Amino acid sequence: MRKVQLVVLLIVLTFGCSPKTFNIKWTKEIAPENFTTRFETSKGNFDIALERSLSPKAADRFYQLVKHKFFDNSLFYRVNPGFVAQFGGNDSVAYKKWNSVTVPDEVVKQGNTKGTFSFARGGKGTRTSDLFINLGNNSRLDTLFYNEVRGFPSFGKVTSGMEVVEKLYSGYSDSTMEHFDLMITNRQEFLKKFPDLDVIEKVYLVD
């Protein structure tokens, strides 16, 4: 009997106390008007300061994702030199859950200058959990009309550590995008193809 109790306790400790990957209530959380996040990566650390008024719904979602550790252990899976460094989730379950609740489209209030920060998207109503840092002055992204939506609203900027961002491995450039689904479903196989990609070890709020 005692052996059974110990087994049950072990199961509870192993699974019952594991962190949740998603709760629909999290998508209702509101970000502070201004906040800063720190990225600890395989190349070093950098900070991004966010301003909610520039894209309120985007800021809320990013705040939610950071608060609930969505980006921890994820990859900078697309680094196009002089253009963008893009990242997102790496857990197939969490990725699917978060992406089931899209972020409403918003107008561009701040341009995509070097060091600014925006959500990636593939058209109208597709902002979810993938973002990019501008590695150059990408003003065309302010007005680009694609799949019924115009522009990529930036809502933050790298305030320290831009030299770290610029050192992220960029040798694969956009070629990784052809294997994006593999990254989500089988990270190990994805990394066999692209072993030099840099990792986001963790992201957290610093104020």
Please annotate each region the language model reported.
Residues 1-23:
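Bacterial Sec-dependent N-terminal signal peptides
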Residues 17-207:
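Cyclophilin-like peptidyl-prolyl cis-trans isomerases
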